[in-house]
Amino acid sequence: MEACPHIRYAFQNDKLLLQQASVGRLTLVNKTTILLRPMKTTTVDLGLYARPPEGHGLMLWGSTSRPVTSHVGIIDPGYTGELRLILQNQRRYNSTLRPSELKIHLAAFRYATPQMEEDKGPINHPQYPGDVGLDVSLPKDLALFPHQTVSVTLTVPPPSIPHHRPTIFGRSGLAMQGILVKPCRWRRGGVDVSLTNFSDQTVFLNKYRRFCQLVYLHKHHLTSFYSPHSDAGVLGPRSLFRWASCTFEEVPSLAMGDSGLSEALEGRQGRGFGSSGQ
């Protein structure tokens, strides 16, 4: 029987509780109150460092019953920095996450990257070599008013990869500005990418700007049937995300600055939030 691949991680944070690190998913829970101001981005420093197994990426997301939306982050293999969760307040007044009201999840997935000699329409090569997702640029100028949701239609079919499904995810750089992209499947007939501006300012995005990323998830990770190893909070109830079967191995030396030791990886290293540069 083939052994499960290992996700190496280090964790140290007095404000979060490591609730579970079972096969496939690591879960943290807040031990202290988190205040989210209206129309302001909130970042939660997790004190968590992680490296996916070969051929895998990592996905980071939050879940709560409170009126708070989490950015779903794609963690690239070359990212060596601390993981942080980006949260947006859905209301126009303060929201409070009391202890145990926020769960933070980290899980692995298998992916592939299409071979493209040149950019194809809005689909571009990633900024850093080895990144999980391809860059997707805006086909037109766009203005988003505060608390406005708009859709961007992309009609060009993405390159196909057998046994993999093209899926849209947001970028952490835009999420830090208050713009969240709703993850969704990119099908042959095109895709409508939904963007919501949670900030208090009108945000102008120029044509050709990178505004989301295209990730080819292995078809195993997309299911319409619920199981203990799936989550409806990532892609929605009609297409559940089922994480890869991996085990978690604690490696304290992964913590940047913990012992002065960090992995000398070329490329992304500590730039960005693990999903995209700012």
Swiss-Prot record:
Record EC number: 3.6.1.23
GO molecular function, one term: dUTP diphosphatase activity
Catalytic activity line of the entry: dUTP + H2O = dUMP + diphosphate + H(+)
Keyword Hydrolase: yes
One example of a Gene Ontology biological process annotation: dUTP metabolic process
Keywords associated with the record: Disulfide bond, Hydrolase, Magnesium, Metal-binding, Nucleotide metabolism
Cystine pairings recorded for this chain: 4-246
Keyword field contains Disulfide bond: yes
CDD domains: trimeric_dUTPase
Family annotation (Gene3D superfamilies): 2.70.40.10
InterPro entries (alphabetical): dUTPase-like, dUTPase-like_sf, dUTPase_trimeric, HSV_DUT
Cofactors required: Mg(2+)
Positions of substrate binding: 76, 84, 171-173, 273-274
Top-level taxon: Viruses
Name of the top EC class for this enzyme: hydrolase
Function: Involved in nucleotide metabolism: produces dUMP, the immediate precursor of thymidine nucleotides and decreases the intracellular concentration of dUTP to avoid uracil incorporation into viral DNA.
Family label: Belongs to the dUTPase family.
Quaternary structure note: Monomer.
Protein name: Deoxyuridine 5'-triphosphate nucleotidohydrolase
Gene: DUT
